[in-house]
Each structure stands twice: as C-alpha cells, then as structure tokens.
Amino acid sequence: MVMYARKQPRLGDGCTDRRDSQPYQTLKYSSKSHPDHRHEKMRDSNDATPPCKMLRRSDSPDNKHMDNTGHGRAKAIHPHRGREREGGTSISPQENSHNHSSLHSSNSHSNPNKSSDTPFEPADDWSEHISSSGKKYYYNCRTEVSQWEKPKEWLEREQRQKEATKTAAVVNSFPKDRDYRREAMQATPASYSSTKSSIATEKPSSLTPSSSSAAVSGLDVPNSASSASGSTVPVSPVMQSPAPPTLLQDPSLLRQLLLALQTALQLNNASVDMAKINEVLTAAVTQASLQSILHKILTAGPSAFNITTLLSQATQLSNQVAQQSSQSPMSLTSDASSPRSYVSPRISTPQTNTASLKPPLSTTPVSSQTKINAMTVKSSSLPPPSSQQPLSTEKHHDNGNSPRTLQRQSSQRSPSPGPNHMGSNSSSSSNNGGGGGGQGPGVVSGAMPPGSVPPGTAPGRATCSFTPTLAAHFNENLIKHVQGWPAEHVEKQASRLREEAHTMGSIYMSENCTELKNLRSLVRVCEIQATLREQRILFLRQQIKELEKLKNQNSFMV
C-alpha cells in the first residue's frame, strides 16, 4: 500500500513551500529555510521531542543545523549523497558515519542530542514519520514510497548499531568521566610501595594469547604509559607494571583475592585475627567496601604475611594433593552443562572432594593436610585436559610472579564466601582450556598453554557455597550414595521416564481429543438431521392444511 505524507500547514509565517509533494524532513535533503526559522529553532530547542519525530518544519534537523550559509550546505550535501549512491554498497557504515560527522562538524549550531535522537545515516533513504492518525510510517525519499512496516535496510542498520554499542559497552566498561588509576593511586598510602611485590604476585605477569578477550570481557588491562582517559587500552602481551586499579574493579576478582588473602593469612598463622576478617568478609557486600578492605589488607605491609613463603607453601600443598589423590584411580570431574559431579576413571590425577564446607573461624594452627580437607576444593568446569603440566615446569614458571599460585590458593584452600556471592571461585581458575572459547568476566589467566591445567586442580565442578549457618548443618556423607555415577544413572532414568510419561500423556490426550471431535461431529450430524425432520414435519403439516382447504372447496362445488 502506497501512502503519501500529508504536509501539515505551518503556523503564521506566510511562507509557502515549493516542494509540497515531498514533505519528508530528514538529514538527507536540505530545504530552503525562511530566516525566521532560526528564531523558531531557538524557541523549539527546549522541546524534548526528538526532531525526527516532529512534523513541523521548524523542528526538522535541517533547520536545527542550518546556519547563514544554508544554501551552500544543502548544495554540499547533495553531491555527497550522489557520490554515496554511485558507490553503492561498498561504503561501510563506519565510513558513512565518518563522512556524516565530517560534513556536520563545522556547524556552530550543532545539537548535542542529535547523535542519540536521530538514527539516520546518509546512506539510508528511509525516514520515519507520524501519520495523521498517529501511526508511524516509513518514507523512502528516493522511490517516494511510504509503508507501515519497517524496511529491511532500517532493521539491518538497527542491528548493526546494537552490535556496535554492545561491543563498545563491553570494551569500554568503565565510565569515561572517572580515572580509576589516578583515584586508586591517590587513595593508596605511601606504604603501598613496600607491598608492591605482594601485589605483583597477585597480578598476571604475562597474558596468554587467548587472553586478549579479557578487554572485551570487562577487564581492561592498562599499560603504564597509557593516557589518563577512560578509552580502551590495547592489551599488551606482557604487562609493564603491576596496576591494581583494574583488579579492584571486578567484584568476583575482589572476592577471590580476599579469600586467597584470608587463607594466606591463616596459613601464615595468627598474625591477624581471623574471626574479624571473616566478619568483615561476610559483611562486605558492595564493591566499594570490598575495595576498601582489600586496600587495607594490601597496605598493611609485608609484616602481616610473607608472600614468598606462601608461594612455596602453595606449591607444596598442591604437590601433596596431587600425590594423595593419585593413589585412588578415580577422580571427580564434572559435566560442563550439569551441576552435579560424577566419578570418572579417565583422568589419572583425581580431585579430592572434601567433607566440610564450614569456613575457618579459628586461628589455631592445624596441619596443612587437615586444612586441605577442611575446605572445599573448587575449580572451574573445564574439559578433560589434553596434557597435564608437570610440577617442575610449574615451579619454573612460578618464579616470575605468575598468578597461577594465586589461582591455586583461591581455588584449593578458599572457604565458602557469604550468601551474596554463590560459587564465585569457579571463575578463579583459568578458563583457557580447549573448547573454553574466551574467558569469563573475572578470570585472571596465567602463562599456561591452552589445554593444560596446573597439577592439583583437575577439572571439577564448583560446588555451590553455603552460608556459615547452613554449612554447620551440612554433612556430605549423607548424600554420597546419590553422588557420582548413581546420581547420573538415577537422573537419566528419571528424565527418560519423564519423557515417556510426557509422550504417553500426549498420545492419550490426542486420542481423547480426536474422540471428542468425532462425538461432537456426530452430535452435529444428529442436530442437522433433527432440524431436517422438523422442516419436513412443518412442510407436511402445511400441505395437509392446503389439502383440507381444497377438500372443503370441492365439497361446496358438489
């Protein structure tokens, strides 16, 4: 259906328009403007309606952007559109937006809301209008065709814009008006320089090739030489300085760091009151409080704990876990799609699932073996690794402040966090194993080749974490009989039975439906037959009356 736009009459300026048959107001074709329109533009600039939705000529984007040399600019835009038409589809939307901005950059009356209010591009001929009945319609200025539906080109352009804004929002995850690096460096006291080595152990010293998606996944990695703007910073393969601010913006990373620091402090024994740290951790809900707590812990100085001893202890503990678990031939691995864990005999270095999820609330020194058993061993859901890295290469890589020790610390010996953050440690171990397909939003990846995981972190599904009150009443021995293969078997049986019941029920229902339809049709047939009989009876009665009349007439005549 072709519908031409009707021109609404302008109010009281007495100027008639020569192009009444083409009333579209778009950015494409400039119309000659009356000088009074500049004053109307000043009055209408307070109107919150976007200019593309209005049908008054004084509100059209052309007149909003028309200066004294309006005719010259109209002439400049026409050959520009002609060039674009000759170019055809070879002009990319980026080039179009660049040309459009370069055409309008010299304008002194530019509207700041124009880029967000007017979704036009110079390459598109469709424009949006409101008809007299109030419905939106779309008008093509080249073919002079109007239609109600959105045209294909319009939908494609909207899709492109959505994708562009989505990628821009993900890459530029921090607001541009704040400089987090400068704020964090101002908020950090002078004693922070003494603990720079401790932070360096918790920051990745090198990034794997697959970690270039870290900037896309919300973790901007700033160079030390980058300017203090919020724009995206290219990810360098090796970081030149330990930069804490980006680390302090990610809530999941903050929680993992806090848990790692907590277990580190507990391993180093009784220099800090662990009950207070636990209280603070459960109370720290917001990201700002987490940042302040982490600043306090980090700037407490190396007197509170010694990072090098922690690294050696972490390596020894992972070695112990690997040796202890290699005695049993099975391991707990997990299906990436299901939340349950099952026993798999495929992997030689198993994962020990432990008995208690209660967070440590005491500072009494316990042996490292019982500490391993007292906390949950958590790791992200990874496919079975193609090659396990031996411990000697692990130690060789660890002397460069590699973050895998931090990952092992936070994944092996971390107590369960508070109720507001369920299973955050599942994202702490690095996610670049085969088939991983990029990284999660809080993943610090170490210098590991893809497909290999550190020893001691065999892929096991992260169990859901409990609040301390729930963890006190949790006993894993009571659910062991439905864990692993039995649970898998029972779930498969249950799903099969559910599907069978569903199909049988649907079959029965369809049979009943067809039977009911058949009976209903029979009832309808009976009704039709009854009406036919009634019609026959009425017809016969009428004939009987006529015959009686004829009989009476005959008797009179005789």
Swiss-Prot record:
Chain segments annotated as coiled-coil in the UniProt record: 529-555
Amino acid composition bias (Gly residues), ranges on this chain: 432-443
Compartments where located: Nucleus
PROSITE patterns: WW_DOMAIN_1, WW_DOMAIN_2
WW domain residues: 120-153
Gene3D superfamilies: 2.20.70.10
Keyword Coiled coil: yes
Polar residues bias locations: 22-32, 188-200, 223-234, 321-378
Composition-biased stretches (Basic residues): 72-82
Ranges where the record places region Disordered: 1-129, 159-244, 321-461
Alphabetized UniProt keyword annotations: Chromatin regulator, Coiled coil, Nucleus, Transcription, Transcription regulation
Keyword Translocase: no
Cellular component, GO, one term: nucleus
SUPFAM superfamilies xrefs: WW domain (SSF51045)
UniProt-listed GO biological process terms: chromatin remodeling; DNA damage response; mitotic G1 DNA damage checkpoint signaling; positive regulation of DNA-templated transcription; positive regulation of TORC1 signaling; regulation of autophagy
Compositional bias of kind Basic and acidic residues: 33-46, 56-70, 175-184
Primary location recorded for the protein, binned into one broad class: nucleus
InterPro entries (UniProt xref): WAC, WW_dom, WW_dom_sf
GO MF annotation, one: RNA polymerase II complex binding
Bias-annotated ranges (Low complexity): 99-116, 204-217, 402-431
Biological function: Acts as a linker between gene transcription and histone H2B monoubiquitination at 'Lys-120' (H2BK120ub1). Positive regulator of amino acid starvation-induced autophagy. Positively regulates MTOR activity. May negatively regulate the ubiquitin proteasome pathway.
Protein name according to UniProt: WW domain-containing adapter protein with coiled-coil
